From Swiss-Prot:
Domain DRBM: 155-225
GO molecular function: double-stranded RNA binding; metal ion binding; ribonuclease III activity; rRNA binding
Protein name as annotated: Ribonuclease 3
Entry-linked CDD domains: DSRM_RNAse_III_family (cd10845), RIBOc (cd00593)
Protein family according to the UniProt entry: Belongs to the ribonuclease III family.
Catalytic reaction list: Endonucleolytic cleavage to 5'-phosphomonoester
CC per GO annotation: cytoplasm
GO biological process: mRNA processing; regulation of gene expression; rRNA processing; tRNA processing
Active site: D45, E117
Cellular location(s): Cytoplasm
SMART domains cross-referenced by the UniProt entry: DSRM, RIBOc
Length: 226
């Protein structure tokens, strides 16, 4: 990666590295068979969890541990990290092996999410905990302003399962009905079947988990109107 590309990414991250080799390592996937980002990812995961937990603790002094845990899970989950990675166009800067490049690894959600954690680890090693905390909070500013402890933090599948259990009904059944598209741009179709609804509910997403969550969300809405 040339210095112009590094400069453009640093502007997006709003952080300038003293040791740019750390940023390059954070962007290097293990498929390249060189010094890759997995150790930085491990470090960044722990730092992100601490920073968000600390912020929630001070923002919401009346909220119990369970609700804070659910809010933190929402903020640090893979979907959120992938969104942040796409805001920074991280895929354009990733260093990948040929196999990953050919299969669209630069846009694979798990790789994008992992790279954000690795960048957090790299910033910490390049600076200190106060600096990386400020950087994370800049990235998360809107999300922290918008998160509401009174809203459902549990995912739709969990809420649907709890709904069925509270009504003493069998648990939902999820069937993978179809997978279409290229490896880097697949669409999964899930059918959800529950007692109380005659028809199957269809959910779609870029991976099986997302498709199941969409199906669960639609099922909950249907059950509420039955």
């Amino acid at each position: 990666m040339n210095s112009i590309n590094i400069n453009s990414l640093e502007l997006k991250l709003r952080y300038s590295f003293k040791e740019r080799s750390l940023l390059l390592q954070a962007l290097t996937h293990r498929s390249l068979h060189t010094q890759h980002n997995e150790r930085l990812e491990f470090l960044g995961d722990s730092i992100l969890s601490f920073v968000i937990a600390n912020q929630l603790y001070h923002r919401f002094p009346e909220i119990n541990e369970g609700n804070m845990s659910r809010m933190r899970a929402t903020l640090v989950r893979g979907d959120t990290l992938t969104e942040i990675a796409r805001e920074f166009d991280i895929g354009a800067y990733l260093q990948l092996g040929q196999g990953e490049l050919k299969t669209g690894g630069a846009q694979r959600e798990s790789i994008l999410a992992d790279s954000i954690e690795a960048i957090i680890g790299a910033i910490f090693l390049d600076s200190d905990i106060q600096t990386v905390e400020k950087t994370i909070l800049r990235w998360y500013h809107k999300r922290l302003e918008q998160i509401n402890p009174t809203h459902h933090q549990k995912d739709p599948k969990t809420r649907l399962q709890e709904y069925m259990q509270s009504h003493q009904l069998p648990l939902p059944f999820y069937l993978l009905a179809q997978v279409c598209g290229e490896a880097h741009d697949q669409e999964f179709t899930i059918h959800c079947q529950v007692s109380g609804l005659e028809e199957l509910v269809v959910g779609k997403g870029s991976n099986r988990r997302k498709a199941e969550q969409e199906a669960a969300e639609k099922t909950l809405k249907k059950l509420e109107f039955e």
